[in-house]
Amino acid sequence: SEDDFNSILNQKNVFKYLKISNGINSRITKSEYLNNASKIKNHILRGDIYEVNYCFEYYAEDINLNSANLFYKLNKLTKSPFSAYFNIDGINLICTSPERFLKKINNDLISQPMKGTMERKSMKTFDMQEAKILKKNPKEFSENVMITDLVRNDISRIAEKGSVIVDEQCGVYPFNHVYQMISTVKAKCKRDITNLDIIDACFPMGSMTGAPKQRAMEIINKYEASQRGIYSGAVGYFNPNGDFDLNVV
């Protein structure tokens, strides 16, 4: 809806741990956002793409920030399983991500695309009725299926023939404040490829681009006002054995 543009900015509690002189600003105006959204819808109607993850940037200047403290508070609030923090040469990343991009253990690969979100009304219990409502939502379900198919196709490029499976389609999981719909794609990677080959075939995560991925990224590059930087990227670890686990930023 037209109110979506300002909804984030109006959530003052999100920024209560920051001391900001000039407020939070958007890189684009509301009219520019709506105009671009309309153009992207036309791409979908013409059959150029099925969906695009269209984003815009909020920014602040002259802020007084204790990044480690902010990360601690946000992580305590969200309890996200793939949170990440670093502070290197004055560049800070504060990430409370719920989504896994790609994990490798020995020859096994797993990716867990996340599409489909609904507010969680009760934090104490897992409400099966709420979960069913999310899973039966045709928009959320179809988005998840499309991105899962994209991820399956990406992984198949570096996987042993016949090894790619969708282990779970559109499972609903409770997180703090929301339910998320997650699918799980598994495969056996080919023996003669490197970790760089694997990431090159699968990056960036389809849930952050759209489908088909290449065309979605072209449209993102055309309509988004600023480069995403590390946003939509990945943070994780590689161990000495060559295994890794990466999130979606």
Where are the model-predicted features located?
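Extended alpha-helical targeting/anchoring segments
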Residues: S1-V249
